[in-house]
């Protein structure tokens, strides 16, 4: 699974979801899906916009967490 650290980053930057949407040009709904870790996919342009607006690296925003195979 991939963990999205958007809520933590917004808290650290004291930035609202609305302000991030305005800074990135992304739809508020898209920001909310990422914030609540409900997004099913994300494109490179979105990642680039988020990293630029948050002044962070991709590794600050996402974390890969291996899952145990439950077969």
Question: What are the language-model segments listed below?
Answer:
Residues 15-33:
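Short alpha-helical DNA-recognition segment
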Residues 33, 62-71:
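Short, charged recognition helix plus adjacent turn
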Residues 38-49:
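Short, basic-rich loop-to-helix N-cap that marks the start of a DNA-contacting helix
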Residues 10, 35, 42, 65:
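DNA major-groove recognition helix of helix-turn-helix
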Residues 10, 21, 51:
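The alpha-helix within a helix-turn-helix
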Residues 1-15:
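A short, Lys/Arg-rich alpha-helix, primarily the initiator
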Residues 7, 18, 48:
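Residues within the helices of the helix-turn-helix
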